[in-house]
């Protein structure tokens, strides 16, 4: 499945696209791909890490940071629950979801691949993606 990293800003923010993030204070959830991307693109000094998404959004609402970079689906919920926030139209990054298995563990790999094949063939995988991820299964 595909995921999208989006940017949440306050209404009236001067941030209109990812191009405007240079020099800004960017909130991220610690250890996420948004954290990795933003730290790599803008440096640790511009990235403020939070233990979870709601804490990052609260910091944005309180004016402690300029924006939040986070997965699209939770971002929609955070914006719906906090008036005065919006998601920018331009995504920060697109990414693929994946399952990691220790190299050489063919027994587990075969079981996971078999289960995914079954779930794909009977439509269960697409139903899960549609309900919880809201993206196209790949």
Regions found by a protein language model. Name each.
Residues 1-9, 34, 38, 72, 76-138:
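Periplasmic-binding protein-like
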Residues 7, 21, 38, 60, ...:
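Residue-level signal for nonpolar/aromatic packing positions in well-ordered secondary structure
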Residues 9-26:
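Flexible hinge/capping segments at coil-to-helix
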Residues 13-14, 30-33, 48-62, 95:
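Short helix-initiation/N-cap motifs at beta->coil->alpha
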Residues 19-22, 40-41, 54-69, 73, ...:
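Short helices/loops that flank or line small-molecule/ion binding pockets
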Residues 25, 66-67, 86, 98:
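Short, Asp-centered acidic motifs that coordinate Mg2+ and/or phosphate
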Residues 34-51, 79-80, 134:
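Ligand-binding cleft/hinge of the Venus flytrap
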